Amino acid sequence: QPISIGFQSRLASFESYIRNNENIFFPVIYQPFTEIKYMMGDKKEQHLEVLFSREFLPNLFITLNYDVDFSPGVYKRSKMQNSFFNGSLRYNTKNNRYGISGYYYNNKIDIQENGGIKYDSIFTNNTETDRSIIDVNLDDATNLIKVAGFSIDQYFNILSQNVNKSKDSTYKERKIDIGRINYHFAYQRNRYVYEDTDPLSYFY
């Protein structure tokens, strides 16, 4: 694909770590469900995920999901934490004539920036095996990315719905359905903050 030149609001290098409405789901379950996952890597990387869903009232389903990844990094100033939360709800009337669904999501990525190591020869010659003490170009720079949004969807069937599927001699199948009214509203806010307490550093 061709690469566009100029200002872009997209954060291409972080897109793989940012989740949005495509990652929201609306499970229909009739028993409370909870799932917890935890993993730790050999470099103290950690991953935690919690998923909870249940039917709170008849036909009212609520789901909550929290996901966080943490890495202390190998080099100086390379710590990273990526967290994601979303909640969704879904409700429809018993006759399915009216329904509403909605969701909220929030991404937060907090990254230390080091600008790379100062002297490439230390790496190429492997003169220092402890990467955590190798000098880097930036000592107090951070990247903060926040992406949050919510949405509401509603529908109303103009004609009542046939919810009785048992076809007896009194059942008459509707031949014409005049449709339904749909409403959709969505909002997303993007925030990207790069900060360095030493903006006059020779690195820039």
Regions found by a protein language model. Give the residues of each.
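Outer-membrane beta-barrel translocator/channel fold
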Residues: 7, 72-148
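Outer-membrane beta-barrel translocator/receptor signature
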Residues: 14-21, 26-85
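Repeated loop/turn-to-beta-strand initiation elements of outer-membrane beta-barrel proteins
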Residues: 59-62, 95-100, 161-163
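Transmembrane beta-barrel strands of outer-membrane/channel proteins
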Residues: 36-40, 66-68, 102-106, 181-189
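Residues on the lipid-exposed face of transmembrane beta-strands in outer-membrane beta-barrel proteins
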Residues: 50-54, 87-91, 150-158
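Face-selective signature of the C-terminal outer-membrane beta-barrel domain
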Residues: 133-204
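Strand-connecting loop/turn motifs
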Residues: 31, 57-59, 93-97, 176-178
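Extracytoplasmic loops and strand-loop junctions of Gram-negative outer membrane beta-barrel proteins
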Residues: 17-18, 33-35, 69-72, 130-140, ...
